[in-house]
Amino acid sequence: LTTRRQRQMCIRDRINTEQPHSFFIPYDKAGDSLTQTLNGTWDFKLYKIDDDIPKEFYKKSYDKSDWDKIPVPSNWQFHTEDFPVYTNIIYPYEINPPFMPSDYNPVALYKRNFNLNKDWENMEVFIHFGAVNSAFYVWVNEKFVGYSEGSKTPAEFNLTDFLTDGNNEIVLKVIRWSDGTYLEDQDFWRLSGIERDVFLYAQPKLAVRDYFLKN
């Protein structure tokens, strides 16, 4: 599912994501949350179309010397030559679902490194994306983790089996317009990127994953 044609021929809107659940922050004890922010400065490279992206961009050895830097969270239209689009009922591209424009549909690569909290040994480690617009793929340490679309909803992945002691590398491939964009034709600015908080959190193997109130 990492190419434009593969996405268009598939009806899945997520791969390996956690089930949606009520949002809460786990704590080991008062004042000691089991979280680690990944907000901040990421390595960044923007391409005009998916087909322009090199095949091995997710490898640790990939040369990033010509990449830029971008703050996360943010929208890349405020940091690049790509442009924001404002419209209401008019789509900003030719209507041909589930297909998207082949001549201009920017795709961005994001990379950063982080050290895993040593106190999280023998715990399950998840990553939380508050919102990524409009669809994205995730790799950790050169291994494919998953895919999600839905530009204003959180997405979470279990990273436990992908992480190593010490330094880890995470890579995102973010697509400006996806087939899910057809369902988001409201009156608002069309912007792209990792636009809400990103953080890791840890939980014991036996833990509360969701809760609800019944009246």
Task: Tell me the role of every PLM-derived stretch.
Residues I15-E18, F24-G31, F83-V85, Q186, ...:
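N-terminal, polar/Ser/Thr-rich
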Residues D28, D43-Y47, I53, Q77-E81, ...:
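Accessory beta-strand-rich segments of carbohydrate-active enzymes
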